[in-house]
């Protein structure tokens, strides 16, 4: 099949790339990651006001843009390219998607316009101290029944969990799984920012002590949550594609100017092979990711498998590319002053997000019956 971006999509991507280059260069990223929030609130508001990023997947009837997963994919690719710390991923994949999928009309009317305007951020608290992203990792139980329940326990590795205005918590409800909305400043909720390898994706530990929560739709099977994770996997893959390409470009440019034995190191066969392999990883990962986004946008039956293929392929490719970018740079690539290590940190951390690459391939095997 032939899949190409439209002229409008290409122009949108280019304009976003320019905005990120002007407003969030790597030098600014290094300053932002030192802050308590871990992301730039003024940049987020600019993304909302000038580019409409938080409104992309919000339907027009809720003051959104009514775009598709393809446009959201393009956003993530550019955010990854600039390793921009931003609540876009959590708010979109772990906020807008579950609300659209499971929320009541009242909840959609209440939350989505504020999201579209960039007024509130969202996230989902799924993993617990075990770090397991599957159903076996959920031990928190929703106490009570009906529209309002209470939650007690611990959630870990919650993306933007220390700053999100609304948190969607995954908890057991009998033999099913429920999603529950909690205010970020709810009584009994303690939020602690975690120290993580990827400095550009802040995470938090959330302690719940009889915290009041409102159900997001009715409890159901894990397949409901799998859909949210599939969308997240596709967007995460797109972010890795952008970061991977930026990392590769960094290595290529350095190989052109770094001389050894009176010639550029890029002229040596060993370096040429590694750079060529990086290009293969980028193109392969982009192809898998674009198809997954297309399948999700069109509602194709193979979206669940395509999402896992994209995530696993991009995770392996990004880990390879970021690692060899450091190697091509030699000793300087390991230093704090060089940007190569920021991409390497993101690669190794993202490789485990939503489950390791091995876990992803095993889940794919289960889905296709192997």
Report each predicted region and the residues it spans:
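Alpha-helical interface subdomain recognition
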Residues: 1-83, 102-105, 114, 118-119, ...
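Structural signature of FAD isoalloxazine-binding scaffolds in flavoprotein oxidoreductases
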Residues: 66-75, 134-138, 182, 210-212, ...
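N-terminal glycine-rich flavin-associated loop
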Residues: 86-106
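Short beta-strand-to-turn element immediately C-terminal to the catalytic PLP-Schiff-base lysine
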Residues: 101-103, 143, 169-172, 181-184, ...
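A short, Trp-centered hydrophobic/proline-enriched beta-strand micro-motif
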Residues: 118-129
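A generic structural signal for well-ordered coil/turn residues at beta-strand boundaries
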Residues: 120, 134-138, 163-165, 176, ...
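A short core secondary-structure module
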Residues: 125, 152-189
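Flexible, small-/acidic-enriched active-site or ligand-binding loops
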Residues: 137-139, 157-158, 183-217
């Amino acid at each position: 099949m032939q899949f190409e971006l439209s002229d409008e999509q290409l122009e949108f991507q280019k304009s976003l790339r320019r905005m990120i280059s002007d407003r969030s260069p790597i030098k600014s990223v290094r300053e932002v990651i030192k802050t308590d929030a871990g992301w730039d609130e003024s940049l987020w508001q600019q993304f909302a006001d000038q580019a409409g990023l938080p409104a992309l997947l919000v339907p027009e009837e809720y003051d959104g843009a009514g775009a598709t997963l393809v446009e959201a994919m393009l956003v993530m690719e550019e955010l990854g390219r600039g390793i921009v710390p931003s609540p876009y991923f959590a708010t979109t994949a772990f906020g807008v998607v579950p609300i659209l999928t499971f929320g009541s009309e009242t909840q959609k009317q209440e939350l989505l316009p504020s999201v579209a305007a960039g007024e509130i951020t969202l996230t989902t608290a799924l993993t617990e101290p075990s770090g397991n992203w599957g159903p076996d990792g959920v031990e928190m139980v929703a106490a009570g029944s009906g529209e309002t329940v209470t939650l007690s326990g611990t959630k870990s590795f919650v993306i933007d969990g220390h700053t999100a205005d609304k948190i969607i918590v995954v908890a057991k409800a009998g033999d099913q799984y429920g999603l529950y909305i909690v205010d970020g400043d709810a009584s009994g909720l303690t939020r602690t920012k975690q120290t993580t390898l990827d400095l550009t994706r802040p995470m938090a530990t959330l302690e719940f002590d009889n915290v009041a929560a409102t159900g997001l739709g009715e409890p159901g099977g894990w397949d409901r949550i799998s859909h949210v994770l599939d969308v997240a996997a596709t967007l995460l893959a797109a972010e890795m594609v952008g970061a991977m390409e930026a990392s590769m470009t960094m290595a290529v440019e350095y190989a052109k100017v770094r001389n050894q034995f009176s010639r550029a190191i890029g002229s040596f066969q060993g370096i040429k092979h590694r750079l060529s392999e990086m290009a293969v990883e980028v193109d392969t990962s982009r192809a898998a990711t674009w198809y997954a986004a297309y399948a999700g946008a069109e509602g194709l039956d193979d979206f669940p498998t395509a999402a896992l293929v994209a995530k696993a392929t991009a995770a392996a490719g990004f880990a390879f590319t970021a690692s060899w970018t450091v190697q091509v740079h030699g000793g300087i690539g390991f230093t704090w002053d060089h940007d190569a290590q920021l991409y390497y940190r993101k690669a190794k951390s993202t490789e485990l997000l939503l489950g390791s690459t091995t876990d992803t391939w095993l889940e794919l095997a289960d889905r296709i019956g192997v």
